[in-house]
Each structure stands twice: as structure tokens, then as C-alpha cells.
């Protein structure tokens, strides 16, 4: 299976690299290509993993891609993504994007990856250590199961990340949206 990973280069999301480090036969795109080139790469791969910062409208390109506007993954990509069943969508509110367009795969909702996001989501007093525990726990669990089908990934993330959420309010709030 050929996997395309679209992970716009951004120092605040480098922890996500852990998710795909054990995937064989992968192509990692962090920027420097156009939206049309990304579309062609999606066609050439069996599975697409998209991760970074985003919104219900898609995955932000964070200025790393050419001719793409704000989003590198948006509704223009939906017809191609619908052809795949084991996609991975990890960005804030990816669940809304997946639901609206009836896509298939593993996805996150409002995932708190920074202290500022924790404050914004009603967790004042959040410490960086809590965010780090949540972030690294999440990606290590996903990374452990990433070569399985998306139902297995989802089931194991819910169970194992749930253990972290028992003592970590950041993980608890993020878990609700997985």
C-alpha cells in the first residue's frame, strides 16, 4: 500500500511526525508543491494522511504550498478523497470536514495541541506538561496502530488515550472529539 502524508511544515505540529514514522512505502509532503500536484499525488496513492492545523473547511497550507490559498485540503479534494477508505484526518475540527463530505477514515475533532488552545477551550491554568503528555500520548498510540485499519486505530486510540484522559483534562477534552 502506498501512503501519501500531507503535513504542512510547522514547528508547532512536529510532534505529529511520530504518527507516520513506521509507515512503509510513504511519500511525505510538507510544502513546496501546488494544489494540482497534491491532487495528482492523491490519485497515485492508496491511502492519504493529512495532519496539521485546520478548521471545518479543511487542512491549512500555512503558507507552505503554492497556488492553494488558505487550505491545501478542502472541498476541491473531496472527490479524490472519497475514492479512498482508510484516510487519516488529524487537525482541529477535521470531524466536521469528514462528516459534511461523508468521507471515510480515522479523524480528530477539536484536538488541543497548544496551551493557548486549552485556554480558548475553557481550561485556564493548563500547563505545557499537560499539553505535551496529551500530544505525545495521542501520537504514540496512533503510531502504534497506524498500519491497521481505521476502525482498529479508532478503537485503540479511544481505549488507550482514555487512560491518559483519566488524569489529564487536556486529553479528556480532546478525547471527547475523537
Question: How should these model regions be labeled?
Answer:
Residues 124-172:
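Intrinsically disordered, low-complexity, charge-dense segments enriched in Lys/Arg
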Residues 1-51, 88-94:
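A domain-level signal for caspase-like cysteine endopeptidase catalytic cores
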Residues 45-65:
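A glycine-rich, hydrophobic loop/mini-helix early in the fold
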Amino acid at each position: 500500500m502506498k501512503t501519501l502524508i500531507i503535513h504542512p511544515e510547522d514547528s508547532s505540529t512536529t510532534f505529529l511526525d511520530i504518527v507516520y514514522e513506521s509507515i512503509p512505502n510513504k511519500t511525505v509532503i510538507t510544502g513546496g508543491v501546488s494544489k494540482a500536484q497534491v491532487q495528482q499525488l492523491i490519485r497515485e496513492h492508496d491511502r492519504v494522511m493529512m495532519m496539521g492545523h485546520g478548521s471545518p473547511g479543511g487542512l491549512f497550507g500555512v503558507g507552505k504550498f503554492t497556488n492553494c490559498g488558505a487550505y491545501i485540503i478542502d472541498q476541491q479534494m473531496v472527490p479524490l478523497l472519497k475514492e479512498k477508505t482508510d484516510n487519516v484526518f488529524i487537525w482541529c475540527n477535521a470531524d466536521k470536514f469528514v462528516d459534511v463530505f461523508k468521507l471515510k477514515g480515522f479523524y480528530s475533532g477539536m484536538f488541543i495541541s497548544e496551551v493557548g488552545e486549552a485556554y480558548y477551550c475553557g481550561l485556564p491554568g493548563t500547563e505545557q506538561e499537560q499539553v505535551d503528555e496529551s500530544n505525545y500520548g495521542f501520537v504514540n498510540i496512533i503510531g502504534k496502530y497506524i498500519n491497521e485499519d481505521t476502525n482498529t486505530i479508532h478503537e485503540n486510540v479511544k481505549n488507550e488515550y482514555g487512560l491518559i484522559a483519566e488524569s489529564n483534562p487536556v486529553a479528556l477534552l480532546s478525547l471527547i472529539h475523537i
